[in-house]
């Protein structure tokens, strides 16, 4: 049973490779939104991982976030995901996600993940190449 309130927190230091300028999502050398989003998704995936059975995985299906403040290269950033609800069939899991740096909140929102059978999911994906 997936427990509401389960959390995972991740931490990393912003490098030049993690900037908006480097990824092409902006022109400035500040922590890029795509990297913040990925960090939030990673925290959610990790929070859910211990509840999965063998052969299962999870995939992101929705991410609704804001990126509200810049973070410079060299500063630490943190992301947290907390399970807020689970669908009746147990296959869809909602999270509250947030990110902050050493000076305060930089972003937040919600994220949804679907629990999938990994082999079946990949087989359906490969079918796309064959059609």
How does the language model describe each region?
Residues 9-15, 66, 112-114:
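Generic structural detector for well-ordered beta-strands
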Residues 1-32:
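Catalytic strand-loop segment that frames the active site of acyl-thioester-processing enzymes
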Residues 31-35, 72, 116:
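Residues at secondary-structure transition points
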Residues 65-102:
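Hydrophobic beta-sheet segments that form the core/acyl-binding groove
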Residues 112-131:
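C-terminal output/interaction extensions
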Residues 45-78:
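Hydrophobic beta-strand-centered segment that forms part of the acyl-chain substrate-binding groove
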């Amino acid at each position: 049973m997936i427990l509401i309130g389960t959390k995972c927190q991740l931490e990393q230091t912003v490098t030049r490779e993690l900037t908006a300028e480097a990824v092409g999502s902006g022109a400035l050398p500040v922590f890029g939104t795509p990297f913040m989003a990925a960090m939030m998704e990673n925290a959610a995936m990790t929070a859910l991982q211990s509840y999965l059975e063998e052969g299962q995985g999870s995939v992101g299906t929705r991410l609704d976030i804001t990126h509200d403040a810049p973070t410079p290269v060299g500063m630490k950033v943190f992301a947290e995901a907390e399970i807020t609800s689970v669908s009746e069939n147990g296959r869809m899991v909602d999270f509250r996600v947030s990110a902050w740096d050493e000076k305060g909140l930089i972003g937040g929102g919600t994220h949804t993940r679907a629990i999938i059978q990994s082999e079946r999911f990949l087989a359906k994906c490969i079918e796309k190449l064959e059609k």
